[in-house]
Structures are given as structure tokens and as C-alpha cells.
Amino acid sequence: MDANQQTRANPFGMDADCRNCPKLCETRQQIVHGYGDVGADFLFVGEMPGEGPDRTGVPFTGDERGEALQHVLGLLGLNNSLPTDDEPELENAFLTYLTRCRHPERPPTDEEVGNCDPFLTAEVRMINPEIIVPVGQRPLTTIATEYTTTPAEEFDVSEDHATTVRGRGFEIVPMADPLQQTDAEREAFVEHFLALMDRDYRQTKGRRGR
């Protein structure tokens, strides 16, 4: 983590009392902004906070889905703490969501995703990652729409899991929902990502295409 970084939690000081989505304001415990290393090469983007992150305030923590992702980060050398920790010691990784507030009974609407887009766009610009990892179908569709020239409907996270997609300024490595991954799928992602980390991925910026 950057020596000048004061905190891993919401390090860019984003609005902690946003009211742009009235229905989500009624159901959330708190806003869950990004967390991690502001100088990270790897940005992981989920759809919305689950019950655990809504409680802890930290993306991908406090529940089984979060523990599954943190376990993978540990295998990749990006998490120096236990998968169950509510404040993981991330290095070279940043975690965030399309939407920052939880609704317990439904996924976010397109309008709610749009309302949160300025937060995600700002994080992408300030972190300037080398690799974006959309976690799940909705993040993959959203990231692909924004950062590739391929029609979003051509992406399927079950097929694109553990592959590398060339984007505009970034490479994209889709990940299936951590809770729905088989052991083989998890191993495939770790193997693919370790191979990616072992090459000079920092020279991929600016390449275009799918």
C-alpha cells in the first residue's frame, strides 16, 4: 500500500451520506464505497453489497461470498490476512461495487447503477488499474459496455470466466460469482491470474479490441 495512504476504507473520501437512490436509503445500513490499495494494479468490481459488507462497510467481507473472494485474493498474494477478516490487509488490489447500497430483496435497477456510476468512474480514473476483474455477470456487462468495443450481449461470465479480454486502456479478467464457482473454476481463475501476474501486464495499456 502507498506509504502516503491513510486508510484502505473509502480512501478517496467519497460521499458517505449519498441520497440519490431513495429506496436504497431505506434498506441500507451504510454506504459501501471502495476499499484497498489506491495504487493497485488490480481492481475487482462486484454488483452490490451483500449482507456482510452492508454490516462491515467493506466490500466482499462479512459473508460467504466475501470469504470466497478473499480466499482467492490470498492465493494470489493480494490479501495478507485471513479470508474472514472484516478489514483485509490488501496489497495491489482494490475492491468496489457498481452500486454502493444494499437492497435485501432485489438487485439494483439500471437507474441505481447509473446513479453510482460517477463513484466507480472516479475510482477507475484515480486508481488507473492495469487489470479490471468484473465479479459476476452484471459487472461484466457494465464494464464491457464502458471499456470494450464488443457488444455487451456477447459476454457471458460463465464462458469468459478466467480469460483475458482486451479493453480500452485496461485488460479485463472476468470472474464468476465466487459462491457459484466449482473447485475447478476457482483453480482455473487462480492459475490464469498467476500466469497474468507473471508476465509484463503493465505494457498492455492502450491496446484496443475485445
Regions found by a protein language model. Give the residues of each.
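A polyanion-binding, active-site-adjacent surface
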Residues: 2-210
